[in-house]
Amino acid sequence: MVDNVSLKPGLRSAWGLSILVDLPSIKMLFDVGPSFDLLLSNAEALSLNLSELEAVFISHMHADHVGALNGLLAYNPKLKVYLPDPKLKLAFVRSGFEAECLEEPAQIAEGVYATGVLRGAIDEQMLLIQAEGKTVMLTGCTHPGIKEALEAAIKASPTNSVYAVIGGLHIGSASEALDAWAYMREVGVAVISPCHCTSPLAKSMLAKLFAEGYVENGVGCEIRLNNI
């Protein structure tokens, strides 16, 4: 929905992230990007009706991930919002919206789980999707670190494992990419689809290391979980 790389004509790119999660149990957004105008423009280009969304999961409170939230809530006020900040949760509730802060691992819908908030310099939470007996981790920027994020995800996952990682990895250099790949390989990650704050150099390195397990990502990318 939103990324700094667009893969299809007619879709706008911008620094930020938003991923549509469309499952039988729930239709939701993982992050919302920097502006509602951008989000709505890409949704319309993709023939997606934002009023059909049931929930929004915010990984962390940086503007490039949460900037569109107020506009989206004005457009679709029935949304349930999962926030990493309990104080903001109270503010949203007082404004009449349904909001929740999941400090600990929890199930959101059938096959959908939250890792709980990883506290640190930048508080962040990851979303887990279980499909075909495999767990996929969605990550906004992985500010806590890929090791810490995966440890939390493995703990929260019904499979006690993570098969695929999709999202921003906050990796810039080749050495960081190599270290991340080594750890992901160690814990059993077989598929990766990096975007947003993952540098072009890191993407290129990860593409070589993961080989057939690498999936190009960007606005317009569609990943069917039963095919990975």
Report residues per predicted region.
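Structural motif
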Residues: 27-28, 55, 79-80, 111-113, ...
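Conserved beta-strand hairpin/beta-sheet module of binuclear metal-dependent hydrolase folds
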Residues: 1-45, 124-139
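Short glycine-enriched loops at secondary-structure junctions
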Residues: 33-36, 118-120, 142-143, 171
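Glycine-rich phosphate-binding "P-loop"
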Residues: 1-11, 105-116, 170
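Metallo-beta-lactamase
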Residues: 83-125, 131-132, 215-228
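Active-site metal-binding motif and surrounding structural segment of the metallo-beta-lactamase
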Residues: 37-82, 157-165, 185, 190
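Cap/insert and terminal regions of metallo-dependent hydrolase folds
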Residues: 68, 135, 141-223
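Active-site neighborhood of phospho(di)ester-bond hydrolases with catalytic His/Asp-centered motifs
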Residues: 29-32, 53-61, 82-85, 137-141, ...
